[in-house]
Amino acid sequence: MKIETILSPSLFSQIEDIDKKVVVVIDILRATSTITTILANGASAVIPVKEESIAREYKSKGYLVGGERGGETITGFDFGNSPFQYKKEIVSGQEVVLSTTNGTKCIEMASSAHQVVIGSFLNLESVVNYIMHLDKDVVLFAAGWQDRVNLEDSLFAGAVASSFARRDCDDATQMARDAYSVAEGNLFETLQNTNHF
């Protein structure tokens, strides 16, 4: 298994043979953390959509819909993009539609992969255990912020990579891994000091 890391959506097109790889989409603040929370709170499914207009179509059909653009909750949606808004008593048993600036765009970009996995610090152990047992190359795909690299997504990529041998990782993965090793003991404070927190 080889692990490569894409630190910005603008680099995603450089991935070769994507249909043979597993892509872990990472948008720590906040889409993938929100998706993980929605599912942990009992939703039957999360439907990620890139376009706000498609999310509105789902809303008109009675679905619960959440999302943001530029960090602001979309007017008329049931929720924003904070995991804390998706309470168990509201989302349990429901299909929830989510549309965000960065994360859902990246999920759609990765849709031609062999498989797409959602990664957040909330499900880190599950993600690592899952991909560890696959016989597929893995792409850690950081959503970043507006096509730019961000620290929180890079740190998660590094956290995943720290469970694998360095020889199996490309340079970007090794950089993320090294950044994580520096921040690991003080992760929450490091995340609080990111531009996007």
Model-derived regions: residue spans:
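Glycine-rich anion-binding loop/nest that anchors nucleotide
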Residues: V139-W145, D168
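Long, charged alpha-helical interface segments
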Residues: E72, D78-Q115, N129, L151-F197
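Short, structured patches in soluble enzyme cores that scaffold and shape functional sites
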Residues: T100-T101, S120, A142-G144
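Phosphate/ribose-phosphate-bearing ligand recognition and processing surfaces
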Residues: A143-D153
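Conserved active-site and cofactor/substrate-binding residues in soluble primary-metabolism enzymes
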Residues: I26-S33, K50-S53, T101, L122, ...
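Residues that scaffold, gate, or flank divalent-cation-dependent active/transport sites
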Residues: E4-D17, A31-L39, A43, S53-V96, ...
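Structural motif
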Residues: I3-E4, K21-V24, S44-I47, G62-V65, ...
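Nuclease catalytic cores that cleave nucleic-acid phosphodiester bonds
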Residues: V117-I118, L124-I131, K136
